[in-house]
């Protein structure tokens, strides 16, 4: 007999907590406030999901480029980190129904706002993306002539944009307002968002009991 023989939902219930992977550096979704407390939409969402399961949410801050690997090696039970549901990812992981719908937004400096009317305008430009993100995948697949610069942290992309190391970066449309509020008008969203994206809670395959419970919880929270 091993823990694997009992479903993950049962393990979570017996443990009294669900372990949640997130970056903790991705405002407004999940980040640390000035007191070092984890806050943000997905922090609240994960706590609400846990509440529906009758357990606590236990957060495991993890860099994005190690996030899916962390799920596989069981560092946590689920991920709530704006994980876009893609065909490739669905082959390896299960996802709940979407809890946010977003798109890709080009972020650039005020003086270059008119250079980026459509995604095709990214060709020949240095474009920042999160390492291992679907933005990186999208850029390489759709604008092969763009020069790709990869980043671990959003803050570094913003910094490099300001000093001119990159011409633009790609980000989640839903995160944009927060970013722009922090940037004193020098940084702008250029063009319309594109490539509609659905974000779900990611978990390891073979945990139908937990998947069903999470989907029901999302229904209940709507």
Predicted regions and their residues:
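Extended ligand-binding regions for polar small-molecule ligands
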Residues: 1-3, 44-52, 131-133, 198-222
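Extracytoplasmic small-molecule ligand-binding "clamshell" domains
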Residues: 1-82
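Short helix-initiation/N-cap motifs at beta->coil->alpha
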Residues: 5-6, 43, 59-69, 114, ...
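Alpha-to-beta junction loops
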Residues: 18-19, 54-56, 73-81, 125-126, ...
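Beta->alpha turn/N-cap motifs
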Residues: 22-26, 60-65, 74-86, 109, ...
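A ligand-binding cleft/hinge motif common to bilobed small-molecule-binding domains
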Residues: 66, 83-91, 139-141, 162-196
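Periplasmic-binding protein-like
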Residues: 101-108, 173, 177-219
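Flexible hinge/capping segments at coil-to-helix
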Residues: 109-127
């Amino acid at each position: 007999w091993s823990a694997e023989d009992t479903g993950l939902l049962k393990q979570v219930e017996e443990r009294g907590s669900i372990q949640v992977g997130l970056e903790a550096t991705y405002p407004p979704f999940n980040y640390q406030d000035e007191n070092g407390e984890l806050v943000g939409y997905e922090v609240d969402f994960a706590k609400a999901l846990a509440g529906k399961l009758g357990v606590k949410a236990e957060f495991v801050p993890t860099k994005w480029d190690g996030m899916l690997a962390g799920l596989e090696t069981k560092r946590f039970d689920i991920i709530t980190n704006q994980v876009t549901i893609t065909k490739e990812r669905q082959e390896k992981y299960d996802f709940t129904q979407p809890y946010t719908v977003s798109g890709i937004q080009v972020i650039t400096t005020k003086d270059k706002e008119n250079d980026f009317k459509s995604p095709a305008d990214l060709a020949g430009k240095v474009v920042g993306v999160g390492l291992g993100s679907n933005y990186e995948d999208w850029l390489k697949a759709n604008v092969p002539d763009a020069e790709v610069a990869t980043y671990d942290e959003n803050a570094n992309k913003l910094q490099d944009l300001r000093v001119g190391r990159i011409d633009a970066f790609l980000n989640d449309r839903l995160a944009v307002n927060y970013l722009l509020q922090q940037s004193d008008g020098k940084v702008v969203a250029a063009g319309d968002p594109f490539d509609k994206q659905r974000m779900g809670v990611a978990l390891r395959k073979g945990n139908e009991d937990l998947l069903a419970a999470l989907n029901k919880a999302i229904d209940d929270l709507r």
